[in-house]
Amino acid sequence: VYDASGDIVTNDHVVGTDTQFKVTFADGRTLDATLVGADPADDLAVIKVAGTNLPAGAMFADSKQVKVGEICLAIGNPLGLASSVTDGIVSFNGRTVNEGNGVVLSSTIQTSAPINPGNSGGALVDLRGEVIGIPTLAATDPQLGGGAAGGIGFAIPSNTIKRIADQLVRTGQITNSGRAALGITAANANGPQGQPVGVLVHSVIAASAAAQAGISVGDVITQINGTPTPDVSALADLLAALYPNDQVKVAVTHPNGTTSSYDVTLGKLG
């Protein structure tokens, strides 16, 4: 519960394409709710309950102050087991993870608290009961056939939750994503043997960071700040860890085979 007005924050992948919901509270009441707004890029959504005498909103900690080693509790409905609580520690604060569906989450809190289907959209809290994150996904292990890797889960940090939820509650949409953007549409570029070699620029948005730096359609982005960008996913991972107005060096290969390095001041997504 985000506030006493009936706003509830959860994961975008939990609400999916639905706009109408049923919400069951701890006192046993089940009330109707509607979608307020969603932010797929950060995997967050807000729904609103219609009713009176609603619970007060949760208290949110400053996720930047969360320390590795702190004990934390994951609260949710794993495997349909309502109001379950699991414990663990904060394993890392500030991890960038790829959900595998085009969504790259930055600054996540990695935790050893077990995260199972049904935990998504719940709460990760500290021992003061303050929300430090929303459990969102667990790591998978290819050696386990894609099964969950025990003790490695990720939560969207409370500071991101507050920044995004405040905008959704206020306007139903995101007006300040806080995410860095180059201002291009792109696709994977492959070499003669099909190997990934970079990110092909399909289009450049007028007046965007890329346009102002001189990046053109047909260029292939190969590095950001010296880190290779073999494909779109790698580029997205790097951008997710950066912020608007950050200055970066972008290495490109032009259609004629020559190379250039551009100083780019990143723009803002959304």
Locate the predicted segments by residue.
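PDZ domains, with a preference for the canonical peptide-binding region formed by the helix
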Residues: 16, 223-251
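A short, glycine/Asx- and small/polar-enriched loop/turn
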Residues: 195-196
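Alpha-helix capping/termination and helix-coil
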Residues: 168-172, 208, 228, 243-246
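Extracellular and select intracellular beta-sandwich modules with Ser/Thr-enriched
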Residues: 260-262
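Serine-dependent protease modules
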Residues: 1-192, 206, 236, 255-258, ...
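Conserved PDZ fold ligand-binding element
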Residues: 2, 8-9, 210-233
